[in-house]
Amino acid sequence: YVINGEKVVVANGANADHVIVSARTSGEQSDEAGISLFLVPADAAGVEAIDYRLMDGQRVANLVFKDVAVSADQRVGELGAGFGLIESVVQQANLALAAEGLGIMQQLNAKTVEYTRTREQFGVAIGSFQALQHRMVETFMAYEQTKSLLYRAVCALTDEQEDAATAVHALKVMLDRAGRQIYSEAIQLHGGMGITDELDIGHYAKRLMMINTTFGNGDYHQAQFNALRYN
């Protein structure tokens, strides 16, 4: 086999000594069948890694393949059956990312509550203002709803339930919506300090933004959820 093409935004792609590459070995471009996986050395002839950072500081790379020769011995799994393996791994990865995102949401809520207890305006702590208390209750509820969906998705995937994929899609939709709500409120309630490098609020927000776009954003997972649930 000879691989040509490019894989973009590969996490730690420039640091790996081997990469598993999906390539079409049969079928049409949009077919699920016909995708095969190959284990390719990162230093193989024709492989180029273009390294860069995302806005949250994570290192990724674009991997360019030009006439990269691979043998049948380098194939992972059955010929043309790679799509199912990819889907399985991505579901597990989405759970891991959601757990990380949930931890960030918890920290943003906790740090915001603590800040409003110490930041004073008009001679009193801003956390005593009922309007701000309501907003912090809303973000707490958003966090709890996301946590419940994470637990549900973990159970569904672990038990190989029929609706496991639907549960993961629902989780990613909630993570996107609740995450945006929580980091937006955290930044606003911290004021201008919320976007400075001195505080970790902005760093958490940027990481949460990247988590919410990795392996599909909320709109993508909403469409996938609808297709599985209602079609």
Segments (PLM) and residue ranges:
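Residue-level signal for inorganic ion chemistry
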Residues: 5, 38, 63-65, 105, ...
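Alpha-helical interface subdomain recognition
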Residues: 1, 88-231
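Short, glycine- and charge-enriched coil/turn segments that flank and shape catalytic ligand pockets
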Residues: 27-33, 71-79, 158-163
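A short core secondary-structure module
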Residues: 4-48
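Solvent-exposed alpha-helices and their adjacent loops that cap or buttress functional pockets
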Residues: 1-2, 11-15, 27-32, 53-58, ...
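A short, charged helix-loop
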Residues: 61-89
